[in-house]
Amino acid sequence: MLNPQTRRVRLFARGSWAETRRIAGILRDETISGGLLLAATVLALGWANSPWSGTYDSLLATDFGPAALHLDLSVQQWAADGLLAIFFFVAGLELKREFVAGDLRDPSRAVVPVAAAAGGVAVPAVLYSLLNLHSGALRGWAIPTATDIAFALSVLAVVGRCLPTALRTFLLTLAVVDDLLAIVIIAVAYTGELSVVPLVAAVVPLAAFTLLVQRRVRAWWLLLPLAVLTWALVHASGVHATVAGVLLAFAVPVLRSEGAGGPQAGPGLAEHFEHRWRPLSAAVAVPVFAFCSAGVTVGGLGGLGDALSDRAALGVVVGLVVGKAIGIFTTTWLVARFTGASLERGLAWVDVAGLALLGGVGFTVSLLIGELAFGPGSARDDHVKVGVLTASVTAALLATVVLRLRNRAYARIHELETADDDHEDGPDA
């Protein structure tokens, strides 16, 4: 008889009921965001390819903001530098909470999505680089490294309604880790001229913000100015301003201190802030950025062919569709192979393949990195946008085919996960 301590770890095992309910709420918000993102993308593409495309370009180029603070930015810059800072703030809160108080505080559960995210970043970057060694577009190597969680979950909402919660959680965590890795890449690889003085000065409001939230201060009139000042100084330093969103998120405590009653007294400020800011991120920040970045003049089938003949666009398509699938699937398999773990009962490796394909739905962060690599509005950036859109649609269709084949098995698992024959609070399983 096996010692309980030596029982094999199961990949994608069900988490706690409380964590399952929390994740379900997040997934609902992200699915709504995905619908808005798709609508914004269609609107932008339609406008950019209409006889009134000039008005779209004029709108994006409109400057506003305090010039004295060097913040007289265009609408497109505000969307990329300002609104996406909110998106990364929420992503940072979610990631910190998962690893401090969620099911992923258990290293045996955290290793799979973290390793899969790393593989899903490394392999696309390598494939893109190999295709662009001599094309002059090597600077865009990071474009196919990101997964768009809102877009991916909107696909799941249509084709995988009964997908086991553990698989949804895996995809969510993978995408969040993916986004945080992208922020590190942006900070390191896409920072131009670095101004040390504003960067050092940003430490002051960041430290004040940290001190206040650690003391459980919620007053927006204190915290918001400090957050905005931190963002403005990071922006002035030359580091991409979205980095400020992650730094602020990591400063927020997840658990209550002992002086505030300890973890048993209720959630910390991270969950409070997440509830406040996630709707703004999901319903405003991501869709508006998509509207500002996805509007590219395609020019019919001929224009589509010309765009995809650019090695940069081709590298993006191969990186997202092929590289993501190989990186996520292979890394997950290797973790299972070298740890002796096995899949949860009822699941098969084809399920992991479906999620790996869905990881190739890259949009928001891929478009952002494309703009940073080649400059917004440049011909190559437009080609990259076409590549991102083509790859995302292709990956979504391939994932749909794979996941549809398993819907009957998912329905059986869903029935077991949600059965409540004893009519108590929560399923029997």
From Swiss-Prot:
GO annotation terms (biological process): regulation of pH
Catalysed reactions, as listed in the record: Na(+)(in) + 2 H(+)(out) = Na(+)(out) + 2 H(+)(in)
Membrane-spanning parts: 32-52, 73-93, 111-131, 140-160, 170-190, 193-213, 219-239, 243-263, 284-304, 316-336, 349-369, 383-403
Keyword Ion transport: yes
GO CC entries: plasma membrane
Membrane topology recorded in Swiss-Prot or TrEMBL: Multi-pass membrane protein
Chief localization: membrane
Domain of life: Bacteria
KW Protein biosynthesis (keyword) present: no
Any one GO molecular function term: sodium:proton antiporter activity
Keyword terms: Antiport, Cell membrane, Ion transport, Membrane, Sodium, Sodium transport, Transmembrane, Transmembrane helix, Transport
Location of this chain's protein in the cell: Cell membrane
NCBIfam families membership: NhaA
Record function comment: Na(+)/H(+) antiporter that extrudes sodium in exchange for external protons.
HAMAP family listed in its UniProt record: NhaA (MF_01844)
Entry similarity comment: Belongs to the NhaA Na(+)/H(+) (TC 2.A.33) antiporter family.
Name of the protein described by the UniProt record: Na(+)/H(+) antiporter NhaA 1
Organism: Frankia alni (strain DSM 45986 / CECT 9034 / ACN14a)
Originating gene: nhaA1
